[in-house]
A protein has these predicted regions:
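Iron-sulfur cluster-binding electron-transfer modules in prokaryotic oxidoreductases
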Residues: 1-239
């Protein structure tokens, strides 16, 4: 099984520790993981800004670069969901899309493919889990609150294996944090207020940290939570190797 590690552009530039933690944990579990150095942005920012047609070349290049891997794993539910859900629609009739059927968020890969039953290290602290919109509703990392289905949460399943951890979820646990990619740029006041409300609910749980698998949401909330001195940690950063 060969895995291609996809590190989104914003992770590479602003949140590199998430990419490093993902690579190290995959190696810990004996995965044959490779980082294709020619990878670029998945094209989501361009498409979300209304330039979907101009993103097609980027999308085709991404698809061609990763097509020979068995799985593509990313430390970002948002970017993974974009490749999975929107690539086939954008490339329909123009380019054979292979990557959409191989892309997975790191939690999804650990839970559904590797089916891990242990994690290394320990984290003796209380955490509040952030469920991202894309992770919940497009990747199925947890059950959406608006649907009458049997509750599940793959993020919490993974965290439950961490020695010493205490897990909480905030009120309105799967409500948007306000990031939304270009939304945070085009509607900064609304985005910030949504983020403040989200952080306030995380803090109300009594947790010492906020954690989750979607680096984009965590990056957004980290800027807002800084004045509250509320640490935000990528989920794999809690698992020391």
């Amino acid at each position: 099984m060969r895995v291609g590690l996809f590190v989104p552009c914003y992770v590479d530039a602003l949140y590199p520790e998430a990419g490093v933690a993902t690579y190290k944990l995959l190696k810990h579990y004996g995965v044959d993981v490779d980082y294709p150095e020619k990878q670029t942005c998945c094209g989501q920012p361009m498409a979300n800004a209304g330039f979907q047609n101009k993103s097609e070349k980027v999308i085709e290049a991404f698809d061609d670069l990763f097509r020979d891997y068995d799985y593509i794993v990313a430390p970002s539910a948002s970017c993974a969901a974009y490749v999975k859900v929107y690539y086939p629609k954008i490339l329909e009739g123009k380019h054979e899309c292979v990557s959409s059927g191989k892309i997975m968020d790191i939690v999804e890969f650990l839970h559904d493919v590797l089916k891990v039953d242990h994690v290394p290290g320990k984290f003796p602290h209380a955490v509040s889990v952030h469920n991202s919109c894309h992770g919940v509703r497009e990747l199925g990392l947890s059950s959406p609150s608006e649907r009458n289905v049997q509750p599940f949460n793959k993020i919490i399943d993974l965290l439950n294996m961490v020695d010493g951890i205490t897990i909480h979820e905030p009120e309105r646990k799967d409500e948007c944090c306000g990031f939304g990619g270009m939304f945070s740029i085009e509607e900064p006041a609304v985005s910030t207020r949504m983020g403040e409300d989200k952080i306030r609910r995380h803090m109300a749980t009594g947790a010492e940290y906020v954690t989750g698998p979607d680096s984009s949401c965590l990056m957004h909330m980290a800027g807002i939570a800084k004045k509250e001195k509320m640490p935000i940690q990528f989920i794999l950063s809690l698992i020391h190797i």
